[in-house]
UniProtKB/Swiss-Prot annotation:
The protein's role, per its UniProt record: Involved in the secretory pathway as part of the exocyst complex which tethers secretory vesicles to the sites of exocytosis. Also plays a role in the assembly of the exocyst.
GO BP terms: exocytosis; protein transport
Cell location: Bud; Bud neck
Protein name: Exocyst complex protein exo70
Main location: other
The entry's keywords: Exocytosis, Protein transport, Transport
Gene3D superfamilies associated with the record: Exocyst complex component Exo70
Superkingdom classification of source: Eukaryota
InterPro entries membership: Cullin_repeat-like_dom_sf, Exo70, Exo70_C
Provenance organism: Emericella nidulans (strain FGSC A4 / ATCC 38163 / CBS 112.46 / NRRL 194 / M139) (Aspergillus nidulans)
GO molecular function, one term: phosphatidylinositol-4,5-bisphosphate binding
Gene Ontology cellular component list: cellular bud neck; exocyst
């Protein structure tokens, strides 16, 4: 048992020895590897220090190489413009021909692009080349401008606007095929204008050329309409009737100018771009609008000298021009300010005319040298009322003017009146009715004063004023618009005050006659010392018997005086000129006053005459018939 155990230990011991031997070899190998690593690290550091400068030099060389490539490319780009000059110069100097316009425009674009490249480098060495290119571009631009004038000039023969207006035809414009040629020419001129020195408005000679050619075409075509507008005024020099709406040529002139602008705008939109469109329209139409403004100023001068009859033309001009300015701005976005500036003097005249219309009405009434002795009305009434009826046809412009003035401020042209604070939310219809009412009251008050000065009798004054009121009332009733504006209770009451005063003035002439029929002093002398009972039958015999001889004589004198006064007033009444309505109204008023008084007086005292007619010329029936005959 001992021997096998020793053998096992011996084998294990041998294996341990082998392991120790291997471990020793591993240690030696590890030391060798460590030594190799140290040597390798040392060698790596040596290599690193050797290669570092080489790598840096390589990077520098790469940067230098890239810079050289860029310089070469820049040189190539610098050579290209010079090549373009050589390539395009011949085409440009030869000028545009009918069959080579696209090539010519392409040559201009090439030179323009080359010039832009040269100027972008900012090199002093390029200054000579830039100068040469600029000169060449200027030559080409000049030739294009000549061509533009030529092509635009082919379509500027003046036209007759009335032909197109009366037949409702569109106004002619530049043909589409011509626009297709002109548009790129203008674009080339605009591009070249950046580099080529030029004069003119809008930043481009193309705009000025277009305006210089097309502007006179519009002005010349519309010239006859301007003359016609002024000639229609000359025919009104001796006409004292109010201006009739639409009879002046300014409306047709405005329509024509509007259509010219629209036609021009359609062409401009296709030729120019951006802000150049608005500038082109303004420059092109400026001369035509200036002539239009001049015409309006001349019309305004005439209006100011004939305000009472021709202020309506001012209102019409305001209505027309204001509407045109907004319509044109809506379609083109331009020209509104030019139209409103042209309108300014007329608008000021229109404001002034409202106060002047009141003053002129008053002055004309006060200046009447004499009135018809038969009480007939003055023609001034018809003239003023026709003017007011005409005024209702201009509600839109008047609403603007009255609102800007403020309620009542039309009564004075003074600065203090014009500066009165305005109602922030005025009713234009109310303002209009107040103004019309002011004119009517001014007329009636002035004629009342004049009637008191020129008519010696109350009867003549009353008839005259009643006739005046009748004409005013008739004019109001005949005009639906005038009736609408003066239909408020306040307006009716204010106007009716004059009717009542006129009637009262006429009845004053009959007061003396009616006084003969008043016998208050005799009623106290009845028997028994008491007043007679009112109502019931009157016993004339008893009353007459109760009178003393003196009282009877006084009553007889009253009958005689009444008869004479009544006959005189009846004759005068029939001799007066009265409007149909006036004669009827005044007769009824007289009858309402005299008939009951006479009936009472006759019933009481007719027995004095005993039916002989010596004192009682009229019985109740004959007096009533006589009064009825006054109508």
């Amino acid at each position: 048992m001992v021997a096998p155990r020793d053998t096992a230990f011996a084998e294990e011991s041998a294996e341990v020895e082998v392991l120790y031997a291997n471990l020793e070899k591993l240690k030696r190998l590890t030391k060798k590897i460590q030594g190799s690593l140290v040597r390798l690290e040392t060698g790596g550091n040596v290599v690193k220090h050797a290669i570092g400068p080489i790598y840096s030099n390589t990077q520098s060389l790469q940067i230098t190489n890239n810079n050289i490539d860029r310089v070469i490319e820049a040189i190539e780009r610098l050579r290209q413009p010079l090549d373009a000059k050589n390539r395009e110069e011949g085409v440009i100097r030869a000028g545009p021909q009918p069959n080579n316009l696209p090539q010519y425009l392409a040559a201009m674009r090439g030179v323009n692009d080359a010039l832009m490249d040269l100027t972008s480098t900012n090199l002093k060495s390029n200054q000579k080349a830039i100068s040469e290119f600029t000169s060449l571009l200027g030559i080409g631009n000049s030739k294009l401008q000549d061509l533009l004038r030529l092509k635009l000039g082919e379509h500027v023969s003046p036209i007759e606007p009335l032909h197109y207006l009366t037949k409702d035809l569109p106004f002619p414009t530049i043909p589409e095929d011509r626009i297709a040629e002109i548009a790129p020419i203008c674009a080339a001129i605009n591009s070249a204008a950046v580099h080529v020195p030029h004069r003119g408005e809008g930043g481009s000679p193309a705009l000025k050329i277009y305006a210089d050619v097309r502007g006179p075409y519009i002005s010349t075509s519309a010239q006859n309409l301007a003359i016609a507008s002024l000639n229609t005024l000359k025919r009104r020099v001796d006409d004292e009737s109010p201006y009739k709406q639409g009879t002046n040529g300014i409306g047709t002139y405005s329509d024509a100018l509007e259509n010219f602008i629209y036609a021009e705008w359609e062409a401009i939109k296709r030729i120019f771009t951006g802000d150049h469109r608005g500038l082109a329209l303004q420059m092109t139409c400026r001369s035509a609008i200036a002539e239009y403004s001049k015409t309006i100023r001349e019309l305004n001068d005439y209006i100011r000298t004939n305000l009472l009859t021709d202020c309506f033309l001012a209102f019409e001009i305001i209505d027309i021009v204001t509407a045109k300015s907004y319509d044109i701005e809506l379609k083109t976005g331009e020209l509104k300010s030019l139209f409103l500036e042209a309108l300014r003097p007329v608008r000021e005249t229109a404001k002034y005319s409202l106060a002047e219309l009141l003053e002129e009405t008053k002055r004309r009434a006060q200046a009447i040298p004499m009135l018809p002795p038969n009480g007939a009305p003055t023609p001034l009434v018809d003239k003023v009322m026709r003017s007011l009826i005409e005024l209702t046809g201009y509600q839109k412009p008047l609403a603007s003017i009255l609102t800007s003035l403020g309620d009542g401020n039309w009564r004075s042209t003074s600065a203090s009146s014009m500066n009165t604070p305005l109602d922030v939310n005025p009713d234009s219809d109310v303002l209009f009715s107040h103004f019309i009412l002011d004119v009517i009251e001014t007329l009636l008050i002035a004629l009342e004063a004049r009637a008191r000065q020129l008519h010696r009798t109350k009867a003549a004054q009353g008839v005259f004023l009643s006739n005046v009121f009748c004409l005013v009332d008739r004019a109001i009733r005949s005009s639906p618009e005038l009736a609408r504006f003066l239909g408020s209770p306040d307006s009716v009451s204010r106007i009716d005050t004059f009717r009542k005063r006129a009637t009262s003035t006429y009845l004053d002439a009959w007061k003396e006659t009616s006084h003969y029929l008043l016998d208050v002093q005799y009623t106290s002398h009845t028997r028994g010392g008491s007043r007679p009972q009112s109502g019931g039958a009157v016993d004339s015999s008893a009353i007459v018997k109760s009178l003393s001889s003196r009282d009877k004589d006084a009553i007889k004198d009253k009958f005689k005086a009444f008869n004479a006064s009544f006959d005189d007033l009846v004759a005068r009444h029939k001799s007066f000129y009265m409007e149909r309505e006036v004669r009827s109204v005044l007769a009824r008023e007289v009858q309402a006053v005299l008939e009951p008084l006479y009936a009472r007086f006759y019933d009481r005292y007719h027995e004095l005459d005993k039916g002989r007619g010596k004192y009682t010329k009229y019985d109740k029936g004959s007096l009533s018939a006589q009064l009825a005959s006054l109508q």
